[in-house]
Amino acid sequence: MRKTYINGLGCISVQETFDTIFLEKAEINENDTILPVKTPVYKDFISPVAIRRMAKGVKNGIVASAMAMKEANVSTVDAIITGTGMGCIEDSEKFLKAIIDNKEEFLTPTSFIQSTHNTVGAQIALGLQCKAYNLTYVNGSISFESALLDAKMKIEEEEANIILVGGIDENADYTTSLFKLAGFIKRENEGPYKVLNATTKGAVYGEGATFFVLENEKKSTTYAEILDVEIINKLDVNEVESKCSAFLEANGLQVSDIDTIVLGFNGDVEFDPYYKILSENSFKNTPQAFYKQLSGEYNTASAFGLWVGAKIIKTQEVPEIISVNNLEKPAYKTILLYNQYKGIDHSFTLISKC
């Protein structure tokens, strides 16, 4: 069975994760409940004519994918697989608002055409003139992991050699207001909004696009090997440790073999115990990292988490800004990532140095 290597990365997020090495310009914002994306210079990647018609999620996805392909030194791919929770929600809102404002008459189709969840994958394919396998997974907070698992299986089964995989989500005003009403987002005027040891419900929300070029061959640009991905729909808090141990054992590993665990803490006091049980028990003597204090919470934030894990292996450091317990190891070879959202859609991802 062939191996799967991460050979290129591209990340557009609420931090300056482009034109940097690894979070040296990152800042923690504990005052706002919604974190806007930091945008690159779009016209360096997309023609100004096309930019006008694109929502930010589409633009960010195109730029992040271009960065990943440039780093991996590839010009075409055998498959494009994306994951998104809310899709191009900004254009969906525009179209629905136009229906109401115009009383269902004289509607322009642009926002409707651009509002589908697979718009990002389609626009990337159009730009590359790529007519290969193109699939978008819309599966809540495991949308990205579903795409990653599909890509890994295609490489293992020798159905593709080079695959572009990404996770994309964007914020939109009306949807955000609904999330606030539902209690998904932290209440205003309750800051500072700390992620670790939080005492309130909800999370600080963000947005972003993170892409990876996966190949079956190791290259000079290789970050890490993807060893395994597992998705579990529902778990009780007291089941997490046993499921984690079983996942490691299936890969011939033990807790002591993990050099860093990357956890998806988001500051929701109701559901962060899923992470705490690993942090305070099985992995209490293991270096721990967290990332949603930088990225914010969104359906495909775990793609940002994988970007963090890959960078740790490449740079052989865990920056202080993402360290949970300030423990260190002389080398970071094997990293475990764990994420969940509101107690469902749990994922374990295992990567290693090649």
Regions found by a protein language model. Give the residues of each.
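Conserved "HGTGT" condensation-loop signature of ketosynthase/thiolase-family condensing enzymes
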Residues: 1-135, 145-149, 153-157, 168-354
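Catalytic nucleophile serine of serine hydrolases
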Residues: 140-143
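Alpha-to-beta junction loops
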Residues: 159-161
